[in-house]
UniProtKB/Swiss-Prot annotation:
Keywords attached to this entry: Acetylation, Electron transport, Heme, Hydroxylation, Iron, Metal-binding, Methylation, Mitochondrion, Respiratory chain, Transport
Residue numbers carrying N6,N6,N6-trimethyllysine: K80, K94
Protein name in the entry: Cytochrome c
Annotated family: Belongs to the cytochrome c family.
GO cellular component: mitochondrial intermembrane space
Compartment(s) of residence: Mitochondrion intermembrane space
Molecular function GO terms recorded: electron transfer activity; heme binding; metal ion binding
Residues where 4-hydroxyproline is found: P79
Positions bound to heme c: C22, C25, H26, M88
Keyword hit for Iron-sulfur: no
UniProt source species: Ricinus communis
Post-translational events: Binds 1 heme c group covalently per subunit.
Its biological purpose: Electron carrier protein. The oxidized form of the cytochrome c heme group can accept an electron from the heme group of the cytochrome c1 subunit of cytochrome reductase. Cytochrome c then transfers this electron to the cytochrome oxidase complex, the final protein carrier in the mitochondrial electron-transport chain.
Pfam families in the record: Cytochrom_C
Length: 111
């Protein structure tokens, strides 16, 4: 199913998901450094593997995906299937609601 069919996202619920499942490896604040994963500030509309100062896998750079609601929705279901060879160890979020919530939060937090 695509993002168009996803339930409406809840920013607060998405923030909780980010804090429990993503924040150990990612930051969202402008100017915050990279951790295990890249800072996600300015994520929407950016091409995969292009954040300055972060060492990406060749897979991430070569995928050249444009991050947006649809691509993130698919990616977050199963990152390793979406970008084979990615360094991201996160197994993904199976529930459409969780993905919609996280995307709603990221849209706000990374803008």
């Amino acid at each position: 199913a695509s993002f168009b069919z996803a339930p409406p996202g809840b920013v607060k619920a998405g923030e909780k998901i980010f804090k429990t499942k993503c924040a150990q490896c990612h930051t969202v604040e402008k100017g915050a450094g990279h951790k295990q994963g890249p800072n996600l500030n300015g994520l929407f509309g950016r091409q995969s593997g292009t954040t300055a100062g972060y060492s990406y896998s060749a897979a991430n750079k070569n995928m050249a995906v444009q991050w947006g609601e649809n691509t993130l929705y698919d990616y977050l279901l199963n990152p390793k299937k979406y970008i084979p060879g990615t360094k991201m160890v996160f197994p993904g979020l199976k529930k459409p609601q969780d993905r919609a919530d996280l995307i709603a939060y990221l849209k706000z937090a990374t803008a």
